[in-house]
Design a protein with these regions (language model features):
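Compositionally biased terminal segments of proteins
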Residues: 1-182
Length: 182
């Protein structure tokens, strides 16, 4: 629809800017789940950059005369949200989730809405969705997205084990993953 074509042009702008600066970045969350699993319509595109890079991205966009919103935690610009930390806090537990060198080593280049974007690995997208774990009762699709990714992807289980350790999530998430068939 119209929203997706608007986002497409904006995503192309962001992709070219970040790549020109050789920044490390990746599409994450819903848009990545769309690429790896069920093709739900894309409402917006979430991007993860390395820790501390948000001010750099703000400056790059402002140099292009883009009016961005930045609250210190995330950048919002025309359907694109940029984060540098997606650490999850649930039920008093903290699951660290940042674009570290391990996650960066698993990035892949794929087409999304006409732009050749970098995307977090299916393992990283899956673990984020499972850790968030929100369902329809919260108006979210985390577990449905997780199931879709599992149906359509093969996983590097060694890498998944490493990421679970980094997230301090092995005990919490392994049973959920097993129930989902991983």
């Amino acid at each position: 629809g119209a929203a997706m074509s608007l986002i497409a042009g904006n995503l192309g702008v962001v992709q070219r800017l970040l790549d020109a600066q050789q920044l490390t970045w990746g599409i994450c969350a819903g848009a990545a789940a769309h690429l790896y699993g069920d093709r739900r319509p894309i409402q917006d595109v979430d991007l993860l950059v390395t820790t501390g890079q948000l001010p750099t991205v703000v400056k790059l966009l402002q140099q292009q005369q883009k009016a961005v919103q930045f609250d210190g935690q995330r950048i919002l610009w025309r359907g694109i949200k940029v984060f540098d930390d997606l650490t999850i806090r649930r039920n008093g537990v903290v699951y660290p989730y940042t674009l570290d060198s391990l996650m960066a080593s698993q990035l892949r280049r794929m087409p999304l809405l006409g732009a050749m974007v970098l995307v977090l690995s299916p393992e990283d997208v899956l673990l984020h969705k499972v850790a968030m774990g929100r369902g329809a009762e919260e108006g979210k699709h985390d577990l449905a997205d997780a199931a879709g990714i599992i149906r359509r992807q093969k996983f590097d289980l060694d890498y998944m084990r490493q990421r679970l350790q980094v997230m301090n999530a092995t005990a919490a998430l392994k049973p959920i993953l097993a129930n989902l068939g991983v």
